[in-house]
C-alpha cells in the first residue's frame, strides 16, 4: 500500500546498506527490469536512460504519461508512488523531486512543504523492505542568470538576473569576502521584498528536502544517492548548499554511496548504470581519466563550480566506477576529456571556428589506445551546449567513431561526463555478464553524435536563424512548423557525413522538438543489426570541422 500525505506511513524496516547484499541478481533467463521515476518527461531524462539500459540488455519501465509532469504541469506523486509499489522490477531509480513534488520544475514552482514532499517518499521504504534496490537523485535548486521564466517561478521575468547576483553575493559574504556584504545588500535592494522572501523560502524548503534525502541513504532506504545541480557557478547559493551537503555526506560516513557533483538531466542515467553494475556484480569499473592537455582538467567549465577533472571523477563515482591513477593497474576503459577551451557556447554564442590541434591530438591518442586494446570513452567538454565539430572530424578521420566505448558532448560538462560515464559502465558491466547488446550500443553512439554534433553544433543554429529566435529567451515552435522538416533534412545530411554505423538512418517522421523549443531535439534511428552489411561506410573525410552556418544565432541559454 502506498503511503502519502494524510496516510499512515509504512513502518520502516529497510536493512542498512552495510548489511544489505550489494547485488540482486536479475530474474533467471530474462532481461533485467528497472523502474524509473524520471526528473521530467523530456527525452534526456527518459529516452537516454532507456538507451543506456538497452546496451546491457535491460528494460527500463516508466510510469504512465498521465502520472508524469508535462513541462509546467506537475506530475501526480500519489500515482507515481502507487505505480512504484505495483511494478514488478529488479531495481528502482527515482527522482526524489518528481516523487515528492511532481517534477523538477514543480520543485521550483509549486507550493509544498518539507513534510508533504518527504511523506510522498514512503513507497521507497516499502520497496527497500522487500529487498528491491533503490537508487535516488535529489537536486539543489538552481539560480540561472536569465530573465526567462519558462522553468522558474513567474517572477524570474524580470528578476532572474538580480536574484542570480544576490545568490552569488550572499555566498561570497558567507565566506567572508571583503565587500561582499555590501554587494549583497545592494543586490537585495534591487529585488522586491516579497520576491526575495519567496526565493529564499523556497531554497530553504528544498535544502531541507535535500538533507532529508541524505537520511534515506543513511538509514539504508536507498542504496545510493546522487546530489546534483545544474546551471551552477563558483559562487552562488547552489554551490554553498552542495558544499554543505557534501560535508554532511562525509560526516555520515556515506562517501562512496552519495555522489555530490554538477549535473542534473543525466543523473538518473548515471544511476541506471550503477544499478546495472549492482545487478550483474563483478566489482567496480576502473576508468583512467586523461586529457591531451592535462592542465585543462583543472579548468572549471561554464555553468559549473568545480574543475572538469573533479566532475569526471565524481560522475564516475555516481555510476559505481572508480577513477584510477595512470600508474595503476590496467583500467577497464580510458576516458579522454576534451577540456574546456573558452571558445564560445553553442547555444548562445557559437564559435565561428574551433582549434583543430587539440582535437587532432585527442583523436590520435584515442586511435593509439584502441589499437593497444584499450576501451576508449570520449567526453567533449570543450564548449558547452554542443560538440566540437573539429573533434568529431578528427575522430572520423582516425576511423574510431564506431570503436568508442562511449561518446557525448551536450549541454554542460556534467551532463556530458555523466552520460559518458554511464554508457561506459553499462557497456563494461554488460560485457562482463555476457549481456552486451552491440546494436543498442551503436545506436546510442550514433544518437549522441547526431544530437550533440549534428543538431546542437549545426542544425540548431540554422533553425534558429530561420525562426529569428531571441538568444535570451526560450523560443516556442508549433509541432507542425515547417522548420521541423528542415531540421530532419539537416540531421539526415549529418548522418550521411558520418562514417560507419551501417544500416542506421534518421527517421524523418520521428523528429520532434521536446517542449516545443529548439534547445533540444529528439528522433528515432531506423535500421539495425540486420542491415549493417547493406550500407557502405561514408568516407571519413566527409565530416566537416565546422559549426553552424555563418550568421546563425542559437538562442537558448544553458539549462
Regions found by a protein language model. Give the residues of each.
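N-terminal acidic, proline/glycine-rich, low-complexity intrinsically disordered segments
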Residues: 1-12
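Long, intrinsically disordered low-complexity tandem-repeat regions enriched in serine/threonine/proline
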Residues: 10-17, 21-26, 535, 539-546
Amino acid at each position: 500500500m502506498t503511503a502519502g500525505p494524510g496516510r499512515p506511513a509504512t513502518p520502516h524496516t529497510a536493512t542498512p546498506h552495510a548489511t544489505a547484499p550489494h547485488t540482486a541478481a536479475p530474474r533467471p533467463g530474462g532481461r533485467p527490469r528497472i523502474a524509473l521515476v524520471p526528473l521530467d518527461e523530456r527525452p534526456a531524462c527518459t529516452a537516454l536512460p532507456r538507451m543506456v539500459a538497452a546496451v546491457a540488455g535491460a528494460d527500463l519501465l516508466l510510469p504512465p504519461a498521465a502520472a508524469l509532469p508535462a513541462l509546467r504541469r506537475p506530475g501526480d506523486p500519489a500515482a507515481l508512488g502507487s505505480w512504484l509499489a505495483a511494478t514488478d522490477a529488479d531495481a528502482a531509480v527515482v527522482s526524489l523531486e518528481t516523487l515528492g513534488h511532481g517534477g523538477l520544475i514543480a520543485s521550483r514552482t509549486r507550493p509544498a512543504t518539507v513534510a508533504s514532499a518527504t511523506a510522498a517518499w514512503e513507497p521507497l521504504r516499502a520497496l527497500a523492505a522487500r529487498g528491491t534496490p533503490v537508487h535516488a537523485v535529489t537536486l539543489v535548486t538552481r539560480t540561472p542568470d536569465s530573465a526567462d521564466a519558462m522553468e522558474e517561478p513567474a517572477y524570474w521575468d524580470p528578476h532572474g538576473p538580480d536574484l542570480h547576483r544576490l545568490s552569488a553575493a550572499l555566498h561570497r559574504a558567507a565566506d567572508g569576502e571583503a565587500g561582499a556584504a555590501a554587494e549583497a545588500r545592494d543586490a537585495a535592494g534591487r529585488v522586491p521584498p516579497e520576491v526575495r522572501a519567496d526565493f529564499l523560502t523556497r531554497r530553504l524548503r528544498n535544502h531541507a528536502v535535500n538533507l532529508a534525502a541524505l537520511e534515506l541513504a543513511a538509514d539504508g532506504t536507498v542504496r545510493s544517492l546522487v546530489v546534483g545541480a545544474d546551471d551552477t557557478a563558483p559562487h552562488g547559493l547552489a554551490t554553498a548548499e552542495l558544499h554543505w551537503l557534501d560535508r554532511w555526506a562525509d560526516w555520515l560516513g556515506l562517501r562512496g554511496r552519495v555522489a555530490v557533483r554538477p549535473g542534473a538531466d543525466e543523473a538518473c542515467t548515471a544511476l541506471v548504470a550503477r544499478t546495472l553494475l549492482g545487478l550483474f556484480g563483478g566489482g567496480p569499473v576502473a576508468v583512467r581519466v586523461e586529457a591531451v592537455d592535462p592542465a585543462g582538467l583543472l579548468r572549471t567549465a561554464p555553468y559549473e563550480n568545480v574543475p572538469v577533472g573533479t566532475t569526471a571523477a565524481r560522475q564516475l563515482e555516481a555510476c559505481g566506477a572508480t577513477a584510477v591513477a595512470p600508474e595503476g593497474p590496467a583500467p577497464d576503459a580510458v576516458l579522454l576529456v576534451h577540456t574546456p577551451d573558452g571558445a564560445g557556447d553553442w547555444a548562445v554564442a557559437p564559435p565561428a571556428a574551433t582549434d583543430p590541434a587539440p582535437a587532432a591530438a585527442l583523436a590520435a591518442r584515442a586511435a593509439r589506445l584502441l589499437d593497444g586494446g584499450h576501451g576508449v570513452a570520449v567526453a567533449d567538454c570543450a564548449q558547452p551546449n554542443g560538440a566540437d565539430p573539429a573533434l568529431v572530424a578528427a575522430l572520423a578521420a582516425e576511423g574510431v567513431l564506431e570503436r568508442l566505448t562511449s561518446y557525448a558532448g551536450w549541454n554542460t560538462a556534467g551532463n556530458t561526463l555523466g552520460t559518458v560515464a554511464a554508457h561506459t559502465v553499462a557497456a563494461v558491466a554488460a560485457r562482463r555478464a555476457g549481456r552486451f547488446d552491440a546494436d543498442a550500443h551503436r545506436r546510442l553512439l550514433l544518437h549522441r553524435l547526431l544530437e550533440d554534433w549534428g543538431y546542437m553544433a549545426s542544425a540548431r543554429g540554422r533553425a534558429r536563424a530561420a525562426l529569428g529566435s531571441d538568444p535570451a529567451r526560450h523560443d516556442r515552435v508549433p509541432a507542425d512548423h515547417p522548420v521541423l522538416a528542415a531540421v530532419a533534412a539537416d540531421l539526415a545530411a549529418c548522418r550521411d557525413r558520418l562514417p560507419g554505423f551501417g544500416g542506421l538512418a534518421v527517421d524523418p517522421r520521428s523528429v520532434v522538438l521536446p517542449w516545443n523549443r529548439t534547445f533540444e531535439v529528439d528522433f528515432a534511428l531506423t535500421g539495425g543489426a540486420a542491415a549493417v552489411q547493406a550500407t557502405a561506410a561514408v568516407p571519413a573525410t566527409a565530416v566537416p570541422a565546422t559549426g553552424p552556418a555563418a550568421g546563425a544565432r542559437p538562442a537558448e541559454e544553458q539549462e
